[in-house]
């Protein structure tokens, strides 16, 4: 019997796949548990419509990430911190502080985990910080740390 998997089934198929499985397995397990649906014309059309919808959403998400990248690369995030001799900071500037400043001054909401910083910023001046907005889109934000 041909079935469309509605959920991932270990060793049998992934969500959205169409596979031929034994009739008994399909009727007694997959269909009863709601893990699969019979692959008839109406279910096939539903699956195609769902795939098209997911592709549109993915394209829209990518487009939004590209727009956000353009916006972020034009900005400079201004932060103030106390520093000692030679421009070394007392403490450090973390991705959380950068996110808070972006939210406060530019109304841009980002997740602090999207910032790719090896270490926190520990000196005065300009620093470029990369932000992973989407698996295919990476932006660079300029952060300026000045004396408080």
From Swiss-Prot:
Gene name of the encoded protein: rplI
Keyword Ribonucleoprotein appears in the UniProt entry: yes
GO molecular function: rRNA binding; structural constituent of ribosome
Function recorded in the entry: Binds to the 23S rRNA.
Keyword S-adenosyl-L-methionine: no
Family according to the record: Belongs to the bacterial ribosomal protein bL9 family.
Gene Ontology biological-process entries: translation
Name of the featured protein: Large ribosomal subunit protein bL9
Keywords recorded for this protein, A-Z: Ribonucleoprotein, Ribosomal protein, RNA-binding, rRNA-binding
One GO CC term, this protein: ribosome
Organism: Bacillus cytotoxicus (strain DSM 22905 / CIP 110041 / 391-98 / NVH 391-98)
């Amino acid at each position: 019997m041909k079935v469309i998997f509605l959920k991932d089934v270990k060793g049998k198929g992934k969500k959205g796949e169409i596979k031929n499985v034994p009739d008994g397995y399909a009727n007694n397990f997959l269909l009863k548990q709601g893990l699969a649906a019979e692959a008839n014309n109406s279910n096939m059309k539903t699956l195609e419509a769902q795939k098209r919808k997911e592709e549109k959403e993915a394209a829209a998400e990518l487009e939004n990430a590209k727009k956000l990248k353009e916006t972020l690369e034009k900005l400079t995030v201004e932060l103030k911190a106390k520093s000692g001799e030679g421009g070394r900071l007392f403490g450090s500037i973390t991705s959380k502080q950068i996110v808070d400043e972006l939210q406060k001054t530019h109304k841009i909401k980002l997740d602090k985990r999207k910032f790719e910083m090896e270490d926190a910023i520990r000196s005065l001046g300009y620093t470029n910080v990369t932000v992973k907005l989407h698996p295919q889109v990476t932006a660079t934000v300029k952060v300026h740390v000045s004396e408080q």
